[in-house]
Curated annotation (Swiss-Prot):
Protein's organism: Corynebacterium diphtheriae (strain ATCC 700971 / NCTC 13129 / Biotype gravis)
Domain of life: Bacteria
UniProt keyword annotations, A-Z: 4Fe-4S, Cytoplasm, Iron, Iron-sulfur, Metal-binding, S-adenosyl-L-methionine, Transferase, tRNA processing
Reaction(s) the record says it catalyses: N(6)-dimethylallyladenosine(37) in tRNA + (sulfur carrier)-SH + AH2 + 2 S-adenosyl-L-methionine = 2-methylsulfanyl-N(6)-dimethylallyladenosine(37) in tRNA + (sulfur carrier)-H + 5'-deoxyadenosine + L-methionine + A + S-adenosyl-L-homocysteine + 2 H(+)
This protein's encoding gene: miaB
Domain MTTase N-terminal: 17-133
Lineage: Bacteria, Bacillati, Actinomycetota, Actinomycetes, Mycobacteriales
Official protein name in the record: tRNA-2-methylthio-N(6)-dimethylallyladenosine synthase
Length: 516
């Protein structure tokens, strides 16, 4: 059962104090940090001004990336002197690394004031208050989810694009991954709560939403009533329901799992106009032997079959992936099989990682670890292959018209080139010349159309000028320096029939109660 979130509420504990949240890791952590920011503002804190030292620094940590612990403790060491100069300064550590190293964070960095985990973000204000009162570090790590993060308010990072979690946790047992042990088994939100959160974002001008889950297409696997069997069509139904939300122009999701990626989801993608023609489908390895050792419950033939069906129904879909190089026991033959699959798959881009052992995962104890110099060589060969493919695939778009959602941050050379940056519907970044048929200043969140003139491996260039410019509510928000805030949305675990969200749901759902 979920605990009462009101027990952690400490009104005005941060009154007059500034805060900064520093995020390491994945999109889940980025979205969790939005919740932490909303929670802290509710407790009276305010975001620190640029160039000033915050009174509170919160680290939302990652345990997946290589050297995550070194990065955290190195940064904590740098803050030690700042805290000595300002005794009222507080430091909190949360997230996956805190969940994993619950017994060692304070031992390694005794100047930390509060430690919390992935399951109890809502406890942070209470921990900070107790730490200040008791003059000691307060550590509270729980082993099961206290409540969905969605019951916390959120201060969004973007005026035009928002994250919405559909679930927490993961039921897979990949031998290289520590996430399930840190975030627990999968638990799914009610469709009505998800739709209410999407609607609340759209009402404030957000035009693009990304649905988040560790295994997003397994949505619907775990209901509050154990007698209710899983609805294997739940995610496709959710996509179609989001398609009916007026004002939601772009819908994305990440990350799916190939083993559970079904025909109905592909059909929903193809038949729902606001679902973007983009798919991130993690491969991890092209070797069936390595996939078996990873406990990835699919093989390369199935993976390529999914891509073939997606492209048959969504001809211009952009497909990206994740690949691990140098998994224990990977031979040169295994690696060649990965290269062969990459050649056949024609990914738009690939996030490639050199395998490194993660303590607490089965693969960390495998005897046949691949030498680092071999891993590096294979990694460079894979990068070279994917860069060639990316360039070839991007070159096919030269001369085509693209619709871009203008981004707040762009290319490193934009100041020099006077270009701006937008993201196309298929997820590609495009640096464009902002001259042409424009309606006043082009702001982040506005929508423009232009023609691609040049292709690079990691982005496109459009120097043909703007053909159309549509000013948006998100652009107005960006120009005013504002971002959306979303109120708590209930924690329901059931899966009733999907319907339209209640108009006031996101404004009135303040408790841990359920309801669609």
């Amino acid at each position: 059962m979920f605990n009462d979130i009101e027990s952690h509420r400490v009104p005005n504990v941060g009154q007059g104090r500034s805060f900064e949240v520093r995020t390491f890791g994945c999109q889940m952590n980025v979205h969790d940090s939005e919740r932490l920011s909303g929670l802290l503002e509710e407790a009276g804190y305010h975001a620190v001004a640029d160039g000033e030292e915050p009174d509170l620094v919160v680290f939302n940590t990652c345990a997946v990336r290589e050297n995550a612990d070194k990065r955290l403790y190195g940064t904590l060491g740098q803050l030690r002197s700042a805290k000595e100069k300002n005794p009222r300064m507080q430091i909190a550590v949360g997230g996956c690394l805190a969940q994993k190293d619950k017994d060692t964070v304070v031992a390694k960095a005794p100047w930390v004031d509060a430690v919390f985990g992935t399951h109890n973000m809502g406890a942070l204000p209470s921990l900070l208050s107790r730490s200040e009162h008791n003059k000691r570090a307060e550590v509270e790590i729980v082993d099961s989810l206290e409540q969905f993060p969605s019951v916390l308010p959120a201060k969004r990072e973007s005026a035009y694009a928002g994250w919405v979690s559909v679930s927490v946790g993961c039921n897979n047992t990949c031998t290289f991954c520590i996430v399930p042990s840190l975030r627990g088994k999968e638990v799914d939100r009610r469709p009505g709560d998800i739709l209410a959160e999407v609607q609340a974002l759209v009402d404030q001008g957000v035009s693009e939403v990304t649905l988040l889950g560790q295994n997003v297409n397994a949505y619907g696997v775990n209901f509050s009533d154990p007698d209710i069997q899983r609805d294997r069509f739940a995610f496709s139904k959710l996509l179609r329901a989001c398609g009916k939300i007026e004002g939601l122009e772009r819908l994305r999701f990440t990350s799916p799992h190939p083993a559970e990626f079904t025909h109905d989801v592909i059909d929903a993608m193809a038949e729902t106009p606001n679902v973007c023609p983009q798919l991130h489908m993690p491969l991890q390895s092209g070797s069936d032997k390595v996939l078996k050792e990873m406990r990835r419950s699919y093989r390369s033939k199935k993976f390529l079959g999914i891509l073939e069906e997606v492209r048959a129904k969504i001809p211009h879909a952009s497909i990206t992936t994740d690949i691990i190089v140098g998994f224990p026991g990977e031979t040169e033959e295994d690696f060649q099989e990965t290269l062969n699959v990459v050649e056949k798959a024609r990914f738009t881009s690939a996030y490639t990682f050199q395998y490194s052992p993660r303590p607490g995962t089965p693969a960390a104890d495998y005897a046949d670890q691949v030498p680092k110099e071999v891993v590096q060589d294979r990694y460079e060969r894979l990068l070279a292959l994917q860069e060639r493919i990316s360039t070839e695939e991007n070159a096919k778009l030269i001369g085509t018209e693209v619709e871009l959602l203008v981004q707040a941050s762009g290319g490193r050379k934009n100041d020099k080139t006077q270009r701006m940056t937008g993201r196309s519907r298929d997820g590609r970044l495009v640096h464009f010349d902002p001259q042409g048929h424009v309606d006043g200043d082009i702001r982040p969140g506005d929508v423009i159309t232009t023609v691609v003139t040049e292709a690079k491996p990691f982005f496109l260039i459009a120097d043909s000028g703007v053909l159309q410019h549509r000013r948006t509510k998100a652009g107005d928000m960006s120009a005013a320096g504002k971002v959306p805030t979303t109120a708590p949305v209930g924690v329901g675990l059931g899966l009733p029939s999907i319907g339209s969200p209640a108009q006031k749901r996101s404004e009135t759902s303040k408790s841990s109660g359920c309801g669609c």
